[in-house]
Regions:
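Beta-strand-rich recognition/accessory modules
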Residues: 89-94, 345-426
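Acidic (Asp/Glu-rich), glycine- and aromatic
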Residues: 136-169, 262-310
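Bacterial N-terminal signal peptides
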Residues: 9-21
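Short, well-ordered beta-strand segments enriched in hydrophobic/aromatic residues
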Residues: 29-33, 126-130, 272-280
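Bacterial N-terminal signal peptides that target proteins for export
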Residues: 1-11
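Alpha-mannosidase-like glycoside hydrolase catalytic domains involved in N-glycan trimming
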Residues: 26-114, 136-235
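Acidic, contiguous internal or C-terminal segments within carbohydrate-active enzymes
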Residues: 116-120, 225, 235-290
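Active-site/ligand-binding surface loops and adjacent short beta/alpha elements
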Residues: 286-354
Length: 426
């Protein structure tokens, strides 16, 4: 005959069981990820959390994948905003036309390695699991002391802030270059405009040596650490130095850079998203003249030269025939210590002029320089108060590019998985 204590214990156990079932039956939200026409491999996904209860209350939230009777914890990250967004990685390989189901519940989040933004007085490093990915330079980096064909009194025109260098490969090679002797104004990864007009006068934010323009870091809006991505938002100023008002900020620009917690040295790649939002804050428009280069630029490692370097575009173009063509993506690669490494740049489908025309150096014995350049299409204007948004994904990889892999990254970027959310309002 059961004792009073055993009956009480049984009731407590039954209560706990029903409580657990109730919790599983009533998540805060159910999320269905649909891969669509393409297979996915380690793909970042996100969804708006508008209307989801407790998201902004400080309550700990946990993401779980539902696989039959199993619920498997998944690392996730909430991006602040109005509304906030939930980010996670669709782990592993997921076939096309597949749906995976997740639930957002109250509970401790899954712990994993994180992406960190580490700031010093001179620069900010983005680090994944202790490995450097990229460095953003907010302090002014002086030009070299001995510059060929540049008078000493003009050397300071080449001092710069507001650019990325180094960009590291997964195994730690430096893939960018700054102040190279053939083009002292090249600054790793940077985004100035070249042939522009303001108040009817030429302003060159790119070449800088004529003293008419430059770009400089202004301030950080945010830095982010997290299990899914880390990054920063930085304000930059495009400055015309010889206007009727003297030195004047013409464009206010925000860089939003995030590095995802995928790939790494073992998998041989990094994945980076870059967004530039530019607004003319001057009283008159900035006129962009038709020109062969200007905009998002990349100067490759000094080792990448001649036969030890290569371009390949999404349309199959190379160094020999790629300049002034248009493409969805372009791979830039070369040998360092006798091993191939590279970075593929993807132009977002919503970018102005997409698929964007490109500046590639065609000379067979030259270095690697790359530029998405919408100004090749003709003259255009940046009117006061209007935002111009440019988005680019970077696939930083070991080895030569594999077209199938490059296209997979493109599909993730241009046609991301769709996430359907059902909010439990009870």
């Amino acid at each position: 005959m059961p004792t009073r204590s055993s009956v009480l214990l049984g009731l407590i156990s039954l209560f706990i069981l029903f409580a657990c079932r109730s919790a599983y039956a009533a998540p805060l939200a159910t999320l269905a990820v649909e891969t669509g026409r393409f297979a996915r491999v380690e793909t970042p996904v996100s969804v708006s959390l508008a209307g989801v209860p407790d998201v902004e209350s400080g309550v700990s939230l946990r993401l779980e994948e539902v696989k039959g009777s199993q619920r498997i914890g998944v690392p996730a990250q909430i991006e602040a905003g109005n509304p906030p967004r939930l980010w996670w990685i669709l782990e592993g390989t997921t076939p096309a036309e597949t749906t995976r189901v997740f639930e957002l519940v109250k509970g401790e989040p899954v712990e994993t390695t994180s992406v960190k933004a580490v700031k010093s007085d001179e620069f900010l490093d983005i680090v994944v699991d202790g490995k450097n990915v990229l460095q953003y330079n907010h302090a002014v980096v002086p030009a070299p002391q001995n510059m060929r064909n540049v008078p000493p009194q003009r050397r300071s025109l080449y001092d710069r802030s507001g650019f990325i260098h180094p960009l590291w490969s997964p195994k730690g090679s430096v893939l960018t270059d700054i102040h190279p002797p053939d083009h002292y104004h090249h600054m790793g990864i940077w985004m100035p405009w070249t042939h522009t007009r303001y108040e009817g006068k030429m302003v060159d934010f790119w070449n800088v040596g004529d003293g008419t323009g430059t770009v400089r870091f202004a301030e950080y809006l945010s830095t982010t650490d997290g299990p899914i991505y880390g990054g920063f938002q930085a304000v930059q100023e495009h400055v015309a130095r010889q206007t009727s008002e003297g030195e004047q900020v013409i464009l206010k620009e925000v860089w939003d850079v995030r590095v995802y917690n995928v790939g790494g040295p073992d998998e041989g790649y990094w994945l980076v998203d870059f967004k530039s939002t530019q607004r003319c804050i001057a009283p008159e428009p900035l006129i962009q003249e038709e020109y062969r280069y200007g905009g998002f630029g990349f100067r490759g490692a000094r080792e990448w030269k001649g036969e030890d370097s290569a371009y390949l575009t999404s349309e199959g173009k190379t160094r020999a025939d790629g300049h002034a063509t248009r493409a969805r993506w372009c791979d830039n690669a070369g040998k360092i210590d006798n091993e191939w490494e590279g970075v593929t740049f993807y132009s977002h489908p919503e970018n102005f002029g997409h698929p964007e025309p490109m500046r590639l150096w065609p000379e067979p014995d030259n270095y690697i320089f790359f530029n998405f350049c919408p100004s090749q299409l003709g003259e255009w204007e940046m009117d006061p108060g209007v935002d111009h948004v440019f988005r680019y994904r970077w696939y930083v990889h070991e080895g030569k590019i594999v077209v199938e892999g490059a296209e997979r990254i493109w599909n993730d970027y241009a046609y991301p998985p769709q996430v359907q959310i059902e909010v439990n309002e009870s």
